[in-house]
Curated annotation (Swiss-Prot):
<dbReference type="InterPro" id="IPR005475">
    <property type="entry name" value="Transketolase-like_Pyr-bd"/>
</dbReference>
<keyword id="KW-0324">Glycolysis</keyword>
<dbReference type="InterPro" id="IPR042179">
    <property type="entry name" value="KGD_C_sf"/>
</dbReference>
<dbReference type="Pfam" id="PF16870">
    <property type="entry name" value="OxoGdeHyase_C"/>
</dbReference>
<keyword id="KW-0786">Thiamine pyrophosphate</keyword>
<comment type="function">
    <text>E1 component of the 2-oxoglutarate dehydrogenase (OGDH) complex which catalyzes the decarboxylation of 2-oxoglutarate, the first step in the conversion of 2-oxoglutarate to succinyl-CoA and CO(2).</text>
</comment>
<dbReference type="GO" id="GO:0004591">
    <property type="term" value="F:oxoglutarate dehydrogenase (succinyl-transferring) activity"/>
</dbReference>
<dbReference type="GO" id="GO:0030976">
    <property type="term" value="F:thiamine pyrophosphate binding"/>
</dbReference>
<dbReference type="GO" id="GO:0045252">
    <property type="term" value="C:oxoglutarate dehydrogenase complex"/>
</dbReference>
<dbReference type="Pfam" id="PF02779">
    <property type="entry name" value="Transket_pyr"/>
</dbReference>
<keyword id="KW-0560">Oxidoreductase</keyword>
<dbReference type="InterPro" id="IPR029061">
    <property type="entry name" value="THDP-binding"/>
</dbReference>
<dbReference type="InterPro" id="IPR023784">
    <property type="entry name" value="2oxoglutarate_DH_E1_bac"/>
</dbReference>
<dbReference type="InterPro" id="IPR031717">
    <property type="entry name" value="ODO-1/KGD_C"/>
</dbReference>
<dbReference type="GO" id="GO:0005829">
    <property type="term" value="C:cytosol"/>
</dbReference>
<comment type="subunit">
    <text>Homodimer. Part of the 2-oxoglutarate dehydrogenase (OGDH) complex composed of E1 (2-oxoglutarate dehydrogenase), E2 (dihydrolipoamide succinyltransferase) and E3 (dihydrolipoamide dehydrogenase); the complex contains multiple copies of the three enzymatic components (E1, E2 and E3).</text>
</comment>
<dbReference type="Pfam" id="PF00676">
    <property type="entry name" value="E1_dh"/>
</dbReference>
Amino acid sequence: MAKDNKDVTEAPVNFGANLGLMLDLYDDYLQDPSSVPDDLQVLFSTIKNGEAHVAAKSTTEGSGSSAGDGTIKRIMRLIDNIRQYGHLKADIYPVNAPKRTNLPKLEIEEFNLDKETLENVSAEIVSDHFKDIYDNAYEAIERMEKRYKGPIAFEYNHINNNKERTWLKRRIETPYRANINNDERKKLFDTLAHVEGFEKYLHKNFVGAKRFSIEGVDTLVPMLQHTLKRAAEIEINNIQIGMAHRGRLNVLTHVLEKPYEMMISEFMHTDPMKFLPEDGSLELTAGWTGDVKYHLGGVKTTSSYGIEQRISLANNPSHLEIVAPVVIGKTRASQDDTKHAGKPTTDFHKGMPIIIHGDAAYPGQGINFETMNLSNLDGYSTGGALHIITNNRIGFTTEPVDGRSTTYSTDIAKGYDVPILHVNADDVEATIEAIDIAMEFRKEFHKDFVIDLVGYRRYGHNEMDEPSITNPLPYHNIRKHDSVEIIYGNKLVEDGVISKEQMEDVMDKVQKEMRAAQDKIDKSDKMDNPDMERPESLQEPLQSDDKDFSVDHLKEINDAMLTYPEDFHVLKKLNKVLEKRREPFESENGLVDWAQAEQLAFATIVQDGISVRLTGQDSERGTFSHRHAVLHDEENGDTFTPLHHVPNQKATFEVHNSPLSEAAVVGFEYGYNVENKNSMNIWEAQYGDFSNMAQMMFDNFMSSARAKWGERSGLTLFLPHAFEGQGPEHSSARLERFLQLAAENNSTVVNLSSSSNYFHLLRAQAKSLGTEAMRPLIVMSPKSLLRNKTVAKPIDQFTSGGFKPIIVEDGNKEKVTKLVLASGKMFIDLKEHLAKNPDDSILLVAVDRLYPFPEGEIKEVLNELPNLETVSWVQEEPKNQGAWLFVYPYLKSLVGNQFNLSYHGRIQRAAPAEGDGEIHKLVQNQIIESSIEK
């Protein structure tokens, strides 16, 4: 057996009973030499270079093996190839298997090995955990070939963590049989019969109606049910599911147990809520404008899997994959305890996310990269999401060759050290094992796991689509292919578990159940209310908080936040800045600037029992070095969070620097707040200009979710916005877009002019949380105004007064002929100009709340000005941007023909701002001068 050794210099390397361990280490060495000790690196390099002779020493009489180094090396290479590339030959395609070329060597013969040779080599050569299981290497390799080339394909060699990789290798290679008894197999078949029977019934009785059938990946439903069972075993009682439209109706029906009557009612356009279970176990919210049935979610409380679990399917727009970070945020909210001082305590066993992706959309949509990047970050981790790709190997009409540049749709997950299993959707019991492995891995390592459920799509993209127009060859084969219901049913018949008659009876029973459900529905009970009015709770704008504070109370809070541990060393330069926060309480001339107003607001909010969570790029310090919510010891780098030491704190405060992402982070915070409505979630953009990277979140969730789905959110956005000569990409948060989205009191949009109004606004928003009146808050937050003394206010403006939608400057109202309205920095620029150039004929008003537009408040001002001639709107943005186009109809209605109405601002522009700072100053001065002209 040593015929290849003639050119090899032999070295006496004999590992004896430790051979299996050493070969496992050698396997690690082949992947990453630095993963083993230095002395083993030297030894293994001699083996790799053909300089050593490795022999297994007999550990018991008559057993053991020896082989030349050439044979050992070939065995090792074969084993390594099977582990790394066996997935390329795995039996994971139910139909239309791809033709693969230029494959790595994966067969015994390709390594000049044979059965006889391998039968004389110990099984330990393959892996040490085989030594007590198989008699020799041939049996062990046979096992590995069946395992790695079977109905589950395994990819884990890309994982850098050696402990995780070793765990997966042992779990995969150790002989395992899913503990599925015949009763459970019957139940699996019954589930599949209901899954497919549901689709067949709808297909027959509602011809052409869109339902985005699950057929082809039907096993998704029993996989989800088994996941819930495994989660219950380790007492995970909150499951958050996110998915797009494909198969959604089936999941709603068979996982969330939405009654057939409700689902069929939606197809018949009758009122489904009449069939909502009376026990309250199923929560289905609805907005006043509504949404299509395959976007709707729900929440089911059930004890079907051993413990009481809350199973949520998130509402979802048509924008594929965009719900993923929302689900992650909802899960983290379910895991966080926020009802105590300090930062939240997180328990990964409280909740778990399941995200169901499409094979075309998973690599195609960047939101998946952003979301997976959150998975191991302290502020965002959920202890592992289960990702299931419902891989029907087509995206509408686009096949994989045109849809991605990778072998598998799951390849993007490799960059995040995530294990990947590909499983044949027609092998029911293999899909159950895939779930077992995933759940065991999550329990052990608290990390994400990806399962690629490889199937097909029985019909077109929707039920009106003819797929053979663009994909004739695949669909020729699909039409001839039996469904998994038939395949698994026949297998149970063949195994003697059920008879053919029993199989047919189960399938017939489903159709009878569906028909009985439809018979309960009154066809004449049509939904025909076109008014679709918003609820009473949204008839009024955000209401001020009426709570008053004493100066002593605010001083106590302020002092606590400026008191550090004795051994904590604040950077001296920063300490001087922070110490100035004592001045408002110690000096008549002391003013509370923007950052201090925010700190005081947050402190009083957590004292009221509302938790605060602030995230964004650089939010701990603040983009403009103003917040300093987390301090760093200048000597050792330790951190200290002043807001964790507020006296009488009843809820948590946390702040996190986010990854350089907008869409996923906004989606996460939105989801967190939807799940925990008593949490004040704030996302802060580095600059407001970058917020449009999350535009889908604003359009499809934040502004419209309540109207579509009845889903309440009180998410707050801080979007730094002001024209300060920094160019077109560091000036505008696109205020106009948020105003365009504003309707039906769905949000509050502000551009503030004072720190005290900011304080009262934050408290008003916090007060609304958890109520029917809660809604998103969009703040055009300041940049240079953060340190502006005109914006800063004395402490007595913080003790009472509440939020003011408008702020009217002092003036002799009898002399006023011109009313100038502005907001944010534009207002401050005008105020500072008029302070230097007084003019009694001009009255300046800060419109701090742009939406809902303060018509009533402005009308009161107009009525108090007997000699008024002109009303002017002044803004820094171009005429086609900013607030002008939004406020114009309101102002026109207010002034009528009684007063002149004028606009002052930049002319219409394609880009928001000038690129040159000096030109910016000229334009800004022109706006100011024109607005105060007689």
